[in-house]
Amino acid sequence: VAKLKVDRKGIEGAAVTVLEQNDGFGKKLLATGNGKCNLTNVKQDPQEYHSSQEEFPWRVICAFPLPETLKFFTGLGIYTKNRSGGLYPYSEQASAVRDVLYMEARHRKVKLKTRERVTGIRKERKLFHVSTETYTYQAERVILAAGGCASSVTGSGNDGFSLAQSLGHRIVTPLPALVGLKGVGSWFAKWAGVRFEAAVALLENDRQIAYQRGEVQFTDYGI
């Protein structure tokens, strides 16, 4: 995506290098939407995003808005279907999205480096020095896309926060935003994988303070 943006702006001679600590690309992408990869959402409204800085999430969304996102993926051959506001590839396979992104990166001569865990980033004058366990890269711009603490099996963790903090960014302590609920009973295992539409309300002193409608999925331990 970064290379596509650079090419569209007509920046001559710009080169993009991707540093990935895993032995392959897109592990977290493959898990998105339970393996079906929800690319984006049609319900893009400032009120849908919760932040102490109300303008920040919307500013990020506007930098790559829905029409441009759809145009980008359509240009790669990925057409979408709408499921309750979430947009998924027609194949409903996250691997299809990962594969076209990988092929497009190769086509645009992006340098893809695997097994390169970034250990430090520092800026000296106009250049960033990005250190890994084996080499130090230099770049005029750096996009830090290390992921958060969720799903450590994909290789993500606290590295991204530590690197951002080392560059002077203030870190807000991350909190779980999407968690499973463990239930009591052996019958859950029989329903594992079953999905259905449901509504959930949060009450405080018999007063409803939050309401959400969406998809619920049973697992072998709960929902």
Please report, for each region that a protein language model flagged, where it lies by residue.
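Short linear loop/turn motifs
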Residues: 82-92, 177-182
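Predominantly flavin-linked oxidoreductase catalytic cores and closely associated redox partners
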Residues: 24, 31, 95-96, 100-223
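Anion (oxyanion) recognition and catalysis
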Residues: 3, 7-10, 74, 106, ...
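Glycine-rich active-site loop/strand segments that organize a redox cofactor
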Residues: 33-84
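Generic structural signal for well-ordered, non-membrane alpha-helical segments
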Residues: 50, 62, 66-69, 90, ...
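Hydrophobic anchor at the start of a short beta-strand
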Residues: 14-16, 80, 142
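Flexible, glycine/proline-enriched loop segments at strand-loop-helix junctions
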Residues: 56-60, 87-92, 146-154
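Glycine-rich FAD pyrophosphate-binding loop
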Residues: 3-34
